[in-house]
Amino acid sequence: MHTACESELLQLITTYDEKDFEYLRKCARDTADRIFGNKIYIRGLIEFSSICKNDCYYCGLRRSNSNAVRYRLTKDEILSCCQNGHELGFRTFVLQGGEDGFFTDDVMCGIVSEIKNRFPDCAVTLSLGERSYESYQRLFDSGADRYLLRHETADKKHYSMLHPPEMSLENRMQCLYNLKRIGYQTGAGFMVGSPFQTPEMLVKDLKFIEKLNPEMCGIGPFVPHKDTKFKNENHGDVSLVLMLLSIIRLLKPNILLPATTALGTVDPLGREKGILHGANVVMPNLSPVKHRKDYSLYDNKICTGDEAAQCIGCLADRMKKIGCEIVTDRGDYTEE
């Protein structure tokens, strides 16, 4: 594992040139190859609710967006997505949704336990936002294996510029530490290029990842949504995202690191580039086709048509072209 002080990280992300960029890319990919071989883990993403109580300023699903199309999948629909995914070879299902009050602990625990009962060889990852310690514990006891909760920014002032007053960075971080304590494989992460972000803030994000020591980290470029206050902002810089992926791989060699949908949205080859810079996870969409375009976190999101998870052969070909292969095992986090 590599380590770097804040001043070294700041210098790296503010002054890197093409030579530094390529050197870090090669080191990161070599590190991933040493630990995982050329394996890329696939996770089946099920976006089960576009209803959210929160009003995050950057998100297309924010409560106050009256143009958003709202839906929620039934338990049977979620299980059907899992069945389709299992037949396609997926062994991890990622259940992601807005903070929708319909999905109480009783409802979610019933869904999780049924997935584990029907598909005992599969891992269940949840991404349901901020919940109580007791809620996280119940979901874990029902069979959930992993939990994704991006912190978005580790700078308190910056967090307040991206979220309404009722949300706090302290609570977000406490949730992450609670998840770790309970025993989840825990995922944090942040946007790159979000409004008001500075290089110093990105360094804070990297140091927080070092401190939290999550099993997973999801980063991607900020992508504006037309129905938010940041609609006229530019999207995050792809090169900087790739640079940060490489740095995270070197700081945390064993981490599960996705090449995110947002990266593929901003750059047609974004996911391949992410893999070449140290990522080792991709998350195709298993959601019902009729709802994919409605889970609109940001504009122009890819994977909204028939091609998403069904085109598993296409994804395999794309990975093969860069010397990697997709694998269908659970892909759990392990220490060296």
What is the predicted function of each stretch?
Residues 46-48, 99-101, 128-132, 153-155, ...:
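Active-site-proximal loop/turn and secondary-structure-junction residues that shape catalytic pockets
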Residues 132-139, 195-209, 264-276:
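Catalytic cores of alpha/beta
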Residues 43-46, 66, 94-105, 157, ...:
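Glycine-rich, proline-tolerant flexible connector loops at the mouths of alpha/beta enzymes
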Residues 63-77, 85-106, 112, 116-176, ...:
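Core AdoMet radical
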Residues 1-19, 86, 210-336:
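Auxiliary Fe-S-binding modules of radical SAM enzymes
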Residues 3-41:
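An N-cap/entry alpha-helix motif that binds or orients negatively charged groups
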Residues 30, 36-77:
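Canonical Radical SAM [4Fe-4S] cluster-binding loop centered on the CxxxCxxC motif
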Residues 28, 56, 95, 149, ...:
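Conserved, mostly hydrophobic/aromatic
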